[in-house]
Amino acid sequence: MIHTLETTVAGRKMKVDFGKTGMLSNAAIFMSYGDTVVMINANASKEPREGIDFFPLSVEYEERLYSVGKIPGGFIKREGKPSDKSILHARSIDRPLRPLFPKGYRNDVQIVNTVLSVEQDNLPEILAINGSSLALCLSSIPFTTPVAAVSVGLVDGEFIINPTVAQRENTILDLTVCATKERVMMVEAGGQEIDEETMYSAIMFGFEECKNIVAFQEEAVAKFGKTKNEPVLYKADEEVEKEVKSFAFDMIKEAMYIMDKDERNAQLDKVKEKISEEFSEKYEDKGADISEVIYKTQKEIVRNMLLNEDRRPDGRAFNEVRPISCEVGILPRTHGTGLFTRGLTQVMTVATLGALGDVQILDGIAEEESKRYMHHYNFPSYSVGEVRPLRGPGRREIGHGALAERALEPLIPSEEEFPYTIRLVSEVLSSNGSTSQASVCGSTLALLDAGVPIKRPAAGIAMGLITSEDLEKEKVITDIQGIEDFFGDMDFKVAGTEKGITSIQFDTKIAGLSNSCVKDALEGAKKARLHILGKIKECIPEPRKELSKYAPRTEIICIDPEKIRDVIGAGGKVINKIIADTNVKIEIKEDGKIFVTSNNEPEGVKKAISIIEGLTKEVVQGEIYLGKVTKTTNFGAFVEILPGKEGLVHISKLDFARVEKVEDVVSVGDEILVKVTDIDNQGRINLSRKDAIAKKEEEKDK
């Protein structure tokens, strides 16, 4: 039987159909918002997965190009692997849902979001978060706390829920808020230097709207929800836990209080060896339980240290940033480099400049078709001292790269100001917490070193949180390192300039953040950000005045848009010849702007511009031109005065004296001065050598 529920969000209808699709799924819903439609299916394995120490949740977000009436490009003509945007949307769905599953739940859970129809005014990724939460709540899977999501814009000082395309073009804030009815679960934001107070107000504005969507989900669950399965939760054997903890607690505590990371890890390895020697025979088949007890003991000690003893593992104050060093120009042949070190976290970012034709072409459901500025993030195994095969970028690398990219996007100059494609690559050389925000700092250094005129330098910081079991007691931590991130409750990343915030991403391991925690984290991040920006400015206070000698050079000329066809030529014949002859790259815009780029060949740029100007310049009656004779006849000579533009010098106009034979005065290949005497209705150009000579003589006399 098909059931339907409807509600209104931001003046538009949100509708959910139950029982319409996916009859064999544990839960399947068909959800629409305006003309945007997403199908969500949620399923779980019947038994827990053995031999793992994590919750195997898998979230998929699949865009179908038929949803916007497009056929995929390329030879295959079907959707391939998920796009970067699809991966980012899947991560945005995962983060607010994962903390709300029961602790110790080890069953495989998969949520598949399939985008079926897209109206650009209504974002499918926002609908997918709401639909994923609702599908889980309706299913028999042990997930019982609804999560809602909205997008928030800021136009002319007014907050807008789920802004339309027109509103998104004018907004200075792109914010996604996910929340339960009691607490904020996740925030993603990009903004044009938004101050902390405005950002906090925007988050709270979105939070209030989320409560209405949560109420809608609760109504649906009350009417159509399945009975929940009793979960089988993993828990370490009580006897093992008691004995191991009794034997090792003091040794683990002593190790955890060592401030130096390497020394602490070395001591922990010794403790683990002692535990293994003590219990390997007695609990031969309980290795996983022993590992779980060690982890829980470490976590208990670190959290107590932070929450009750006001002490951090490395001895810093709660609002203190680790020691920072900045360096630029360390690679001789690249266009720009920045090496940023914060404690044991180190990132090297390299900037590369290219022609505008080097933009990334996007083949997705969004209206955006290309990307001129991009940031890629690499996290090799050696950055954490491990050995593993080197593969392509995973979801984490794509997510961290996009986060740092978003932080700097509002600061990148327009293509008119800086006519280059910009690619940044951040190489994580050492990781001990917050490498994504170190990438923001490294990117700023690299851009300044490359001579990119960004509006202002940007920096990023990660804030952490420790809470008591009842969530009543909480402490916000500045610049979390790996151990605080691993055992803590929050990763709150904030990037921006001295003027305001350009990006936020935060998620939690608990059932959401209090309003006061959000405010404290924003304020703490601002103080830390300003401190880091001071260090960056000490290293390189402004963009370099000159580009690297190895960077390409681009010149811009403007022509009449009606003349674009003359530059391109039939089938691209003219422009391809210019490119081949001058070894340049040419990008033509519809408004008549032409960008000419060459790698280390400035003469090629000048030559190409000269040719283009010749092709597009108008012949003016009365003007004198230096032209080349291309053909002679018995009645006159044809002279090319501009590229592709010829005129006729009649035999009577060649000289003051009577001319019997054209070749007596000029030959093919001669360069002569001619004056345009007439352009007839058919565009034919009449020239006079005699008049040109007379005018030049007249100018000499003056």
Swiss-Prot record:
GO CC entries: cytosol
Enzyme Commission (EC) number: 2.7.7.8
Domain S1 motif span(s) in chain numbering: 622-690
InterPro entries from the UniProt entry: ExoRNase_PH_dom1 (IPR001247), ExoRNase_PH_dom2 (IPR015847), ExoRNase_PH_dom2_sf (IPR036345), KH_dom (IPR004087), KH_dom_type_1 (IPR004088), KH_dom_type_1_sf (IPR036612), NA-bd_OB-fold (IPR012340), PNPase (IPR012162)
Chain ranges of the KH domain: 552-612
Protein name: Polyribonucleotide nucleotidyltransferase
Cofactor(s) demanded: Mg(2+)
Gene3D superfamilies attached to this UniProt entry: GHMP Kinase, N-terminal domain, K Homology domain, type 1, Nucleic acid-binding proteins
Keyword annotations: Cytoplasm, Magnesium, Metal-binding, Nucleotidyltransferase, RNA-binding, Transferase
Free-text function comment from the UniProt entry: Involved in mRNA degradation. Catalyzes the phosphorolysis of single-stranded polyribonucleotides processively in the 3'- to 5'-direction.
Keyword Magnesium: yes
Primary location recorded for the protein, binned into one broad class: cytoplasm
Domain of life according to the entry: Bacteria
GO biological process, one term: mRNA catabolic process
Binding positions for Mg(2+) per the UniProt entry: 485, 491
